[in-house]
Amino acid sequence: GFSQRLGFFPEVGPKTPGKRRFWVQAVSVGEIEAIGPLLRQLKAAGTAEIVLTTTTSTGYRLALDRYADVADRIGIFPADLWPCSALAWRRIRPDVVILVEGELWPEHLAQARARGVPAYLINGRISDKSFARHQRFRKLSHYVLGHFQQIAAGSEEDARRFRALGFDSTVTGNIKFDVASDAPMPAEERGRLRTELGFGADPRTVVLLGSSTWKGEET
């Protein structure tokens, strides 16, 4: 893992004729979970090679578990420093780069622009603190965000903030809501779980779940 952080990404090999190579960076577990539908759609199209990277060890393990049959290569994202990033870029040679949510890696994006590779931000988010910081350092913000060909915002509020900073943004919705379970939980297991949580096994009991109560995520 450490060698990959330095840019020594495993050689991906020659590109397949007729396919574009997508480098998708999802920082950790939440983002890795969320990008499943996107990766599977790219794979199903039959015209994409997928290189998936993540920043954390837990994200890496989850990526291997979930997407070994989807991604052509899974690895660790390089440190966002010129020598490390440039080395990884020479090894991966992507045609498209995709970042998820609030990830802004200036050197990674600079490498994309220098090579004429389009960069996209999906599920784009700007928190209250980040928005204030972007407004305060507007010149730096424009330099970084200006590398994206397109910004797909996770909510109307996020899109409004991107626009306030001078960047066009479309609202695609939060891709985390697109993640569906592969199969329903068996009734017996469902009843056991309800009992363990103190709700009782009666399926008629109404249970309200607040799964994500961070400001801006309540629905």
Q: Where are the regions that the model predicts?
A:
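Charged active-site motifs of nucleotide-sugar-dependent glycosyltransferases
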Residues: 17-23, 200-208, 217-219
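Long, charged amphipathic helices and adjacent flexible linkers at domain junctions
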Residues: 2, 176, 180-199, 207-210
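A periodicity- and composition-biased signal for non-globular, repetitive helical segments
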Residues: 11, 31, 194-196, 200
